[in-house]
From Swiss-Prot:
Organism: Mus musculus
Lineage: Eukaryota, Metazoa, Chordata, Craniata, Vertebrata
SUPFAM superfamilies: Immunoglobulin
GO biological process: immunoglobulin mediated immune response
Pfam families cross-referenced by the UniProt entry: V-set (PF07686)
Protein name, UniProt field: Ig heavy chain V region M603
One MF term in the entry's GO annotations: antigen binding
Tree of life domain: Eukaryota
tRNA processing recorded as keyword: no
Coiled coil: none
Keyword Mitochondrion included in the entry's annotation: no
InterPro entries for the chain: Ig-like_dom, Ig-like_dom_sf, Ig-like_fold, Ig_sub, Ig_V-set, IgHV
Record key words, sorted: Adaptive immunity, Immunity, Immunoglobulin
């Protein structure tokens, strides 16, 4: 069974940091692009970051809203995807999901975790 399980969310003050984790199982983690997507309260899903395999190395990509503040990485030995979030703002409040990108360069995210909630508030 393919599973993604996010953790690490919580309440943090503006300017603070959090690290989210996405533990994966049931597939060859290193073979897939992995994505982070969030949903702010009352708003649509927003793609924010990706870790993508290009040959034998991984590249990262970010949305303009988080670039320079968030860092996506992966531990292939433990099949875990991470999202280090720095300089957090109130507008980063959201449910954060990791997703597997099945087709690679397209926007077909076939497996999602249940999400972890991040609240940025003083």
């Amino acid at each position: 069974e393919v599973k993604l399980v996010e953790s690490g969310g919580g309440l943090v003050q503006p300017g603070g940091s959090l690290r989210l984790s996405c533990a994966t199982s049931g597939f060859t983690f290193s073979d897939f692009y992995m994505e982070w997507v969030r949903q702010p309260p009352g708003k649509r899903l927003e793609w924010i970051a990706a870790s993508r395999n290009k040959g034998n190395k991984y590249t990262t990509e970010y949305s303009a809203s988080v670039k320079g503040r968030f860092i996506v990485s992966r531990d292939t030995s433990q099949s875990i995807l991470y999202l280090q979030m720095n300089a957090l703002r109130a507008e980063d409040t959201a449910i954060y999901y990791c997703a597997r990108n099945y087709y690679g360069s397209t926007w077909y995210f076939d497996v999602w975790g249940a999400g972890t909630t991040v609240t940025v508030s003083s």
